[in-house]
Every structure is written in structure tokens, then in C-alpha cells.
A protein has these predicted regions:
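Flavin (FAD/FMN) cofactor-binding and adjacent substrate-gating region
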Residues: 118-151, 301-314
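Flavin (primarily FAD) cofactor-binding/catalytic cores of flavoenzymes
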Residues: 3-105, 110, 154-267, 271-279, ...
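Core mature regions of organelle-targeted
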Residues: 108-119
Length: 500
């Protein structure tokens, strides 16, 4: 129903329409291929090749043997999504094995891909895989995809299907035998001065549990950003049962025959709109405040070595300028998702249409959006998440001592931004910065979260993971080495393995 981003408008102001089907439209947008008949044998061969790769690339193979207590982990990773899995393998490649990844979900349900992610395809091109393979080609997504579905299929796609990516992550964890402990919800993290480690207070299958670790990596992506952003006008005027957020568990078949309003213009708003129509919604109206849907994705511009590797080294004023510019520009859906939605007959996009008033009456939602009045059966908030570490209960006993940008940086007049000012001020390895020296233990916590997205330059997504994780892992292994330097030197002096 829509031309590319430079589309014309119809006779009604700010309603985008299309008279042609874009070349980006795909009738098989939702299709998932069937594995090859011999996929099992092909995958077995890939795993054999991978095992050979790991043996060849194992130098230096010696692991850390200086744990002060076997009851204390060297590293606890909170979250077993793609970031947590890759962090664990990267630590292993650096000889740090006393690690556990904790995840509150059951096995194969970790991360967002089978939870609230509803995009048919990933938003990044297929070759951007977050560096999960750590330089080992046979661990790369493309090798797994070709083994299971064929080289022709791999060559034919531009973006990986979301559910295939989820399958790959399952295989990644299984073939590497990653130390994932599922059904474990880390609820509080505190510092124990006597033991010089973090205490992770948790529930494991409903029972209380306590774990200890020298270092903690918070690898919970979007879920470690502060929670859902639901506009106050919706919260205050609609009953909870009448609306959802895109991060909710939504029963899409229940929307069959319904008229639905989607608020927000980012990727998740469009993803959910497509699923609503696929489930049989009569119509989906998507409304945004901006006069024009953003059509510029500077993330694509940033995908080069200089930016990814060195942005975090920039002076604070430069990082602030980049971040402020990106926030003002706004988020946009991927082109393939945008065109797929705009070519659906039941979909309409309304720009320049902020919610002015809204109410619920006799099973319907009546709202004024810009200068239009609508009534719908349901409403979905595609309004993103709040970036606020104070709203993250797992961090409640740490955040009072974590420095924010407002504590260490003053922007020029006219460049103030309250949300950015509240972001945690992270070090160059994504570690928290303590407000005072007495809380220096906070630098042993690493924040691999969407809450680090703007000012650190690392968005905790596939475009950034392979550049963020080496910084974290190097910093951890460096501290482990220096903290154990006396033991290590004693071992060095005691070494007595004669060559002849």
C-alpha cells in the first residue's frame, strides 16, 4: 500500500499511501524453509569440522587455576541471550572457565527471539552476526544455515529469518556445551566486602538460592533497560485489559475481526502490526507524533571499524553530540518490514498524529490523534522501553552509587537532555563508574544492555557485540591476572619442569 520513504500523501493530510508494490515486498515474507533431507548428516559433519577448529585454535590452552574459592564464580553472566552466550564462549577462549550464565527462562526460550521479538526477519543483513563465532568460521551462522537448509537458500536471503536465528543460538549453546543455568531469576545483586565478591540473590524453580561471583556481566539486552514505556495518557485513561505493549505476551489470534490502533513508529510497532493483520485483524492504524516517519538509519553508517572500535574513546562532548543527534533523528523500522506493512490493504500509517485525548467506553477505545477521531477495539503500544537503571530491581542496591552522565558531564546550553543525563556513565569496557572510591567494586559490573546504547556507542545488538565483548573480557582477565599476581609469581618461581 506504500511507495518508498519519499512517498506522496493522499488527499487526507499525513496519510501515507502507495499505488505500486515495492520491490522490497515479498509474498513469502513469513515462510520458514524445511531442513534438507540430509540436514542431520550435514550438521554432524559441520560439528566435526568445528571440533577440529577448536582444537587447532586452542593456544594457549591453559585455563585460570587461581580461583580463591571454588564456591565463588569468576564471572556470573545474567542473561543467556546472544550476548550472554557469546560472552561465555569468549571468556572460555581467554581461559576463564569458572563461569555460569543465569537465565530466568527455560532452555531454548532465552533471549527475545521466541518471546516478544515478532519480526519475521532480523533487522540487520545476514552477514552481521555479532561475532559470536569469535573468529572460527565453522561456528558462524552462515555455515550452520547452509548445513541445515542448503547453500542455495543462504545465497537467496538478504536477512535471516528470526526463528532460524533462534534455532542457531540453540545449536550454538549445545555444540559449545555452554554453562547455562535456566529457570534461575537473579533478583538482587549486592557486594560482600568480607568475601570481596558479589552475592546474587535468586530464585531457582521457585526456591531461594544464592550465588557468588567476582565479576558480573549484565547481558539482558532490552530487558535490562528499565522496562516498558507506556505513555501516561494511555495508562491513566484506559483500563489495563484494553491495551498491550509490544513487549507483552500477546494472544494474536484473539484479534481476529478487530480494529486495532498501534501507537509508535519503530520496528516493533510495524512488526506487531504485521502480525495483527496476519492473525485476521480487520484493520490496523499506526499513528506517530512526528510529521514524517524517519527514513535515515545511521546505524548502517556506523558499521565500520573506526566507529565501532574507537567511538567509546571520544571525549564526552563528542559522544553527547552523536547521541543527541541520533535521538533527535528518531528510530525507524527496517525497509523490508516497512514495505511489507505498507503493502497490506488493512494497514494505514498516520503521521503528525499525537494522542490528544483517549477514553474507553462500552468495549471501544475512542481517541483523538492529531486532528482525527478514531474508535478501535484494542490498542498496542509500540513505544519502546524506558532507559532508567533505577527501575531495574536487580540493580536496586547498586544504583545509588553508580555515576550517571549528569554527575560527570555538563552539556552546553541548549544541548541538555534529561534522559541522556540519567544514563549510567560507563567506562571504556562498559563497566559501571562508582560515585566514590569506596564503591570501586562497581567497576566489576559490566552493562551489556540497551541502556548503554547511545553514549557508549554499543547497542548490545548484532552490529556491536563483536566490538563490545572483547573489551569486557580483556578487562576481566586483566583484573584477574593482577589480583592473583602474587600466586602467579609464586607459581612462576616454583616451575621446575626441566627441558633436559
Amino acid at each position: 500500500m506504500m511507495l518508498p520513504f519519499s512517498s506522496t500523501l493522499n488527499t487526507e493530510r499525513n496519510v501515507e499511501t502507495s499505488k505500486t508494490i515495492s520491490k522490497e515486498f515479498r509474498s513469502n515474507f513469513w515462510e520458514i524453509p524445511s531442513p534438507l533431507p540430509d540436514a542431520e548428516q550435514r550438521l554432524e559433519q559441520l560439528e566435526k569440522n568445528l571440533k577440529d577448529d577448536l582444537e587447532v585454535a586452542c593456544y594457549p590452552g591453559r585455563t585460570w587455576d587461581y580461583s580463591r574459592s571454588q564456591n565463588i564464580l569468576e564471572v556470573a553472566i545474567v542473561g543467556a541471550g546472544q550476548g550472554g552466550k557469546s560472552a561465555a564462549f569468549g571468556l572460555r577462549q581467554h581461559g576463564v572457565n569458572n563461569v555460569i550464565i543465569f537465565d530466568k527462562r527455560p532452555a531454548k526460550q532465552e533471549g527475545v527471539w521466541r518471546a516478544f521479538a515478532r519480526n519475521a526477519k532480523l533487522r540487520s543483513p545476514k552477514k552481521i552476526t555479532g561475532g559470536l563465532e569469535w573468529g572460527i568460521p565453522n561456528l558462524n551462522f552462515c555455515r550452520w544455515c547452509a548445513a541445515c537448509y542448503g547453500s542455495d537458500y543462504w545465497q537467496s536471503i538478504k536477512y535471516a529469518p528470526r526463528l532460524l536465528w533462534a534455532e542457531y543460538l540453540d545449536w550454538y549453546a549445545q555444540v559449545l556445551a555452554l554453562p547455562i543455568q535456566n529457570n534461575t531469576d537473579i533478583q538482587r545483586v549486592t557486594w560482600n566486602e568480607v568475601e570481596q565478591c558479589f552475592w546474587l540473590h535468586a530464585t531457582n524453580r521457585g526456591a531461594s538460592a544464592l550465588y557468588k561471583a567476582r565479576f558480573v556481566i549484565f547481558a539482558t539486552g532490552m530487558e535490562c533497560a528499565g522496562g516498558k514505556n507506556i505513555p501516561a495518557i494511555i495508562r491513566e485513561n484506559l483500563p489495563a485489559h484494553s491495551y498491550h505493549h509490544t513487549m507483552d505476551n500477546i494472544d494474536f489470534p484473539s484479534f481476529q475481526g478487530k480494529r486495532v490502533m498501534v501507537v509508535g513508529g519503530g520496528a516493533s510497532a510495524f512488526d506487531n502490526s504485521l502480525l495483527l493483520l496476519k492473525a485476521g485483524a480487520v484493520s490496523v492504524d499506526l499513528t506517530i507524533r512526528r510529521e514524517k516517519l524517519p527514513d535515515l538509519n545511521r546505524i548502517r553508517w556506523s558499521e565500520w571499524n573506526g566507529y565501532h572500535r574507537h567511538y567509546i574513546e571520544l571525549p564526552d562532548r563528542d559522544k553527547w553530540a552523536y547521541s543527541l543527534s541520533e535521538l533527535r533523528l528518531g528510530q525507524l523500522p527496517p525497509a523490508h518490514t516497512y514495505h511489507q506493512a505498507m503493502n497490506q490493504s488493512g494497514f494505514s500509517l498516520y503521521t503528525g498524529s499525537p494522542i490528544k485525548q483517549i477514553r474507553y467506553e462500552k468495549g471501544e477505545i475512542f481517541g483523538t490523534y492529531g486532528d482525527r477521531n478514531f474508535h478501535h477495539d484494542a490498542l498496542i503500544c509500540g513505544t519502546g522501553f524506558v532507559t532508567d537503571i533505577d527501575r531495574q530491581s536487580v540493580l536496586n542496591e547498586l544504583t545509588p552509587y553508580v555515576a550517571r552522565w549528569r554527575d560527570l558531564f555538563t552539556p552546553a546550553p541548549g544541548e541538555e537532555h534529561r534522559e541522556l543525563a540519567n544514563f549510567p556513565y560507563l567506562g571504556k569496557s562498559l563497566e559501571f563508574t562508582p560515585l566514590s572510591p569506596e564503591h570501586r567494586y562497581l567497576s566489576r559490573c559490566y552493562y551489556l544492555s540497551c541502556g548503554a546504547a547511545y553514549l557508549s556507542g554499543f547497542r548490545a545488538n548484532l552490529t556491536d557485540l563483536q566490538f563490545a565483548l572483547p573489551r569486557i573480557i580483556y578487562n576481566i582477565s586483566q583484573q584477574l591476572f593482577t589480583e592473583h599476581k602474587d600466586d602467579i609469581y609464586a607459581d612462576f618461581e616454583a616451575y621446575d619442569n626441566r627441558e633436559y
